[in-house]
Each structure stands twice: as structure tokens, then as C-alpha cells.
């Protein structure tokens, strides 16, 4: 899984778990079809929709040169009903 960096756990992503939607940060060079293939192959699920967006970059200055630090984008992946990704699904107590 060289395209997916890690799962994201924010307030919004935790709320989306109830709608069977999972959030991942992926490398910016990866295409949507590659990510869909990797998720379906690795987690053994069926993907029905994918939404992606680039996060605002954070500026990083090294003396006179201004650069940026974020080289990834965020994908919200919707699974078919009946499928889930077990390590990311938690019961509330």
C-alpha cells in the first residue's frame, strides 16, 4: 500500500464512520483508480464512491526561500452497505 499514508481521525472523519465512509491521507501523485484498487485489494471491501481534496499547504521558510510542507491529499471513501474496515471501526462505550 504505497499510495495510502494513514487513516485520519478528526471529528468529521469519526462522524462519517457512521455513514460507512472512511478517511485516508494519500500521496498526491496517486490516482483515484489506484487508490480504489489498493483499498479494495488490501481491505477486501467494495468501494462505491470516492471524494478527494487537497488540504491547504503550510508554509515553511528556510532563510530567503519560501516552500511548503504538505505533499498529500485527503480521500473520503464510501463503501457498499455490509462492508466495513474492521481496524477503523470502534464501538462507543
From Swiss-Prot:
Q: Which SUPFAM superfamilies match?
A: Ribosomal proteins S24e, L23 and L15e
Q: Which InterPro entries match?
A: Nucleotide-bd_a/b_plait_sf, Ribosomal_uL23-like, Ribosomal_uL23/eL15/eS24_sf, Ribosomal_uL23_CS
* Keyword terms of this UniProt record: Chloroplast, Plastid, Ribonucleoprotein, Ribosomal protein, RNA-binding, rRNA-binding
> Could you tell me which PROSITE patterns the record lists for this protein?
RIBOSOMAL_L23 (PS00050)
One GO CC term, this protein: ribonucleoprotein complex
- Any GO molecular function: mRNA binding
Q: What subcellular compartments does it reside in?
A: Plastid, Chloroplast
User: Which BP terms does GO give this entry?
Assistant: translation
Q: What is its main location?
A: plastid
Keyword Repeat among UniProt keywords = no
Q: Which domain of life is it from?
A: Eukaryota
PANTHER family referenced in this protein's UniProt entry, alphabetically: 60S RIBOSOMAL PROTEIN L23A (PTHR11620)
What family name appears in the similarity comment? Answer: Belongs to the universal ribosomal protein uL23 family.
Q: What does this protein do?
A: Binds to 23S rRNA.
Instruction: Spell out the subunit comment.
Output: Part of the 50S ribosomal subunit.
Which HAMAP family does the record cross-reference, listed alphabetically?
Ribosomal_uL23_B
Under what name is this protein listed? Large ribosomal subunit protein uL23cz/uL23cy
Origin species, per record, is Phaseolus angularis (Azuki bean)
Classification lineage: Eukaryota, Viridiplantae, Streptophyta, Embryophyta, Tracheophyta
Amino acid at each position: 500500500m504505497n499510495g495510502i499514508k494513514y487513516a485520519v481521525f478528526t471529528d468529521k472523519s469519526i462522524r462519517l464512520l457512521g455513514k460507512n465512509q472512511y478517511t485516508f491521507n494519500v500521496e498526491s501523485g496517486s490516482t483515484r483508480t489506484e487508490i480504489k484498487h489498493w483499498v479494495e485489494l488490501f481491505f477486501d471491501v467494495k468501494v462505491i464512491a470516492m471524494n478527494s481534496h487537497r488540504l491547504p499547504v503550510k508554509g515553511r521558510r528556510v532563510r530567503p526561500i519560501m516552500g511548503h510542507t504538505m505533499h498529500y491529499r485527503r480521500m473520503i471513501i464510501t463503501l457498499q452497505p455490509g462492508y466495513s474496515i474492521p481496524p477503523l471501526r470502534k464501538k462507543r462505550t
